[in-house]
Design a protein with these regions (language model features):
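Cysteine-centered catalytic environments shared across enzyme families
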Residues: 2-348, 361, 433
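Glycine-rich active-site loop/lid subdomains used to bind and stabilize high-energy intermediates
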Residues: 49, 216, 309-312, 316-484
Length: 484
């Protein structure tokens, strides 16, 4: 497993000349990959990698290359495979011989063996690029849910890609320029982003579940996986047992690591469940779990309940701490710390984000990194299991548009007139919302309420969840911490 940063520059139609921008791009990747950095000059470009080593620190150096006869492939990979052992076993039966214990080699050989079909066989989170030396073309891919980021821009005959926007901006062909749509993205739908949009002019993002080739025909991306509706035939008891199996299996698979592992513990259902399963699984292996909880100075005095958080976390956290035989850690933040963290949070995210919410996660991850390198969190459980108020509130559910943002008037009022000219806030937001709704899959027998619930789920997965995944990735990796 390698949690890190990848980047590359490919120029197909003219001779390629590297420049000082290589060091500039690598410098932007340092925080995501503090352990190792690698550069591979190519016939038509360069592949870059910065690594936070989690599995096989010595054997997993990248970029990684395989050669046999005239065939040669090189990979830069960011992510983790939760079925790495199964894939490795299949490949070994087919004659592949492994030199390392890392996921990178598994993914490289799987791609060479099965091509694009390796993605459908993979259980994990990843973003990677493979250069085919013989055919002089590049393959890009991103995991199904978009946990791992992958941005790109096309400048004439040159493809520039990377794990973060700042890495692309370090190349001289990519100026940090906003057009009218970019301003609208920040002011109207931020901290979210339109799927596939990189906000800065000309910068895009490989969408979740998509892959494709860059060759003399250009960059051609397509989905290899899409969310589909299927009839639910299980009983309530069967559903509960099935969900339990999937959750326990996912948690156990994500505990695999050659470095210390911990869990976020907020006292909620998701983090409590993860911490409990992880604690017992690690105890069986003779390991002790570390849990990490966050509070704010004087939170008990000033806490105000709301729709998103009707209760303070502290009491539930203490109940779980009493229940679990783990080593528990508290982080208490004060307002001055959050204020100082605001600037770093924007630097980490490359864009305006969620203000103190980003800053608190950044500071929390930094504290956690003092004890462990990997942490499991319950991020996005509400998106998958329908935990938000708008799933339960019929009035909100039936309103058109994004359920979490019914109007943008207040935000739009901050723009100067010269910047606001030509932007229709309602039309912009409605067009983005409708584009997402058109991708919703239904069943013929769905009632109007069931259709609306599917639409709500789609909106949450494509917008709200992507915002949280983006936030988690940037804040944690900026701190040198891998959060799963």
């Amino acid at each position: 497993m390698t949690m890190c940063a990848i980047a590359g520059v490919i120029k197909l139609t003219q001779p390629f000349e590297p420049g000082p921008w290589v060091d500039g791009m690598l410098a932007t990747m340092q925080r995501r990959g503090p352990d190792q950095q690698g550069v591979l000059p190519l016939e038509r470009g360069t592949l870059l990698h910065a690594r936070l080593a989690v599995i096989d620190p010595e054997g997993g150096r990248q970029p990684m290359t395989w050669r046999e006869g005239e065939a040669s492939f090189s990979i830069v990979y960011n992510g983790e495979l939760y079925n790495s052992g199964e894939l490795r076993g299949e490949l070994e039966k087919l004659g592949w011989q492994f030199r390392t214990h890392c996921d990178t080699e598994v993914m490289l050989y799987a791609f060479i063996q099965w091509g694009e079909d390796c993605l459908r066989r993979s259980n994990g989170i990843f973003a990677f690029a493979v250069w085919d030396h013989r055919q002089q073309k590049l393959f890009l891919a991103r995991d199904r849910m978009g946990v791992k980021p992958l941005f790109f821009t096309l400048r004439q005959d040159t493809l520039i890609f990377g794990s973060e926007i700042k890495t692309l901006l370090a190349h001289p062909l990519v100026p940090a320029r906003l057009n009218q749509d970019g301003v609208a993205e920040i002011m109207l739908v931020g901290p979210g982003r339109t799927p596939g949009c990189g906000v800065f002019q000309g910068i895009e993002e490989v969408r979740p579940g998509c892959c494709g080739w860059f060759d003399e025909k250009g960059l051609q991306l397509h989905p290899y996986w899409q969310l589909k509706a299927h009839p639910h035939t299980e009983s309530f008891a069967e559903t509960a047992a099935h969900v339990r199996y999937l959750l326990v299996d996912a948690i156990r698979r994500q505990l695999v690591s050659d470095v210390p592992v911990g869990t976020f513990l907020s006292g909620g259902l998701d983090s409590s469940l993860i911490s409990s399963v992880a604690c017992h699984a690690m105890a069986a292996d003779g390991r002790q779990l570390h849990t990490f909880s966050l509070d704010y100075r004087d939170n008990g005095r000033y806490f105000q309940p709301g729709k998103f958080q009707p209760n303070s976390d502290t009491g539930y956290i203490r109940q779980m701490q009493d229940f679990l035989p783990a080593e528990h850690h508290w982080t208490v933040l004060d307002t001055p710390q959050l204020v100082e963290g605001l600037f770093e949070a924007v630097e980490a995210r490359d864009l305006p984000g969620m203000a103190d919410v980003d800053a608190s996660l950044l500071l929390f991850c930094r504290e956690i990194r003092q004890s462990v390198t990997v942490a499991l969190s319950g991020e996005c459980a509400d998106e998958i299991f329908g935990g938000y108020p708008w799933y339960r509130d019929p009035e909100i559910r039936q309103q058109a548009g994004f359920p979490w943002a019914q109007t943008s008037d207040w935000r739009f009022s901050f723009l100067k007139k010269e910047l606001a000219q030509g932007i229709d806030p309602a039309a912009f937001m409605n067009s983005r919302c409708e584009a997402t709704l058109r991708q919703t899959d239904y069943l013929p027998e769905d009632t109007s309420e069931e259709r609306r619930m599917r639409e709500m789920t789609r909106l949450n997965l494509d917008w709200f969840m992507q915002t949280l995944l983006d936030r988690k990735d940037r804040m944690s990796m900026y701190s040198g911490l891998e959060v799963r």
